[in-house]
Amino acid sequence: MKFFVDTADTADIAEMAATGLLDGVTTNPSLIAKSGKQFVDVIAEICKIVPGPVSAEVVALDHATMMKEAEVLRKIADNVCIKVPLTIDGLKTCKALSDDGTMVNVTLCFSANQALLAGKAGAAFISPFVGRHDDVGLDGMGLIADIRQIYDNYDFGTEILVASVRHPIHILESAKIGADVMTAPPAVIRALFNHPLTDKGIQGFMADWAKTGQSIL
């Protein structure tokens, strides 16, 4: 499973990249606004930190303007992945861009039918929002399983990018289903490293080592 971080905070991105475990970054208009920086500048800075796909989302709602915005965004760096909403105009834009060799991440997916359409439009990634799905009493992981089955049935090249990840269990369940990618806020990724028994074990080892009076260095 590929690990993306969902943030526009370059300090957090650099921290995650330093682990060697980060494969890409997702951003959205809300995260860009929170950064307080210029959109193009933020994406350019992120692309210098992470060589993998960096999702930059168009904000237009019509196909023609989406294409114009995508042209600006994909000139920033070779690893920019254009992010479009799952609408008719978004999928028209996805098809045009993917036919031209541009990576496209189709976002705001809430049904397997929508994911099927994105696969037919040639999306590099489909982003189903599991947390928001769960929020309204639906089964987010069930959605991921349905998309996995459909994509396997028809051998789509589109990767399932699990989004709206709220906690480590979302990541675990997505991995068990066979999702290709997950994107999560920095805090959720950090939580993956933690376990009380690991902490307890380290404390025990350190206490015993201190008693020996030795040093490796």
Curated annotation (Swiss-Prot):
- List the pathway annotation: Carbohydrate degradation; pentose phosphate pathway; D-glyceraldehyde 3-phosphate and beta-D-fructose 6-phosphate from D-ribose 5-phosphate and D-xylulose 5-phosphate (non-oxidative stage): step 2/3
Q: Name one GO cellular component term.
A: cytoplasm
For the keyword Cytoplasm, the answer is yes
* Principal cellular location given in the protein's record: cytoplasm
GO biological-process terms attached to the record: carbohydrate metabolic process; pentose-phosphate shunt
- Pfam families associated with the record: TAL_FSA (PF00923)
Q: Which domain of life is it from?
A: Bacteria
Q: Name one GO molecular function term.
A: aldehyde-lyase activity
Catalytic activity reads: D-sedoheptulose 7-phosphate + D-glyceraldehyde 3-phosphate = D-erythrose 4-phosphate + beta-D-fructose 6-phosphate
UniProt family annotation: Belongs to the transaldolase family. Type 3B subfamily.
UniProt name for this protein: Probable transaldolase
Q: Can you name the source organism?
A: Rhizorhabdus wittichii (strain DSM 6014 / CCUG 31198 / JCM 15750 / NBRC 105917 / EY 4224 / RW1) (Sphingomonas wittichii)
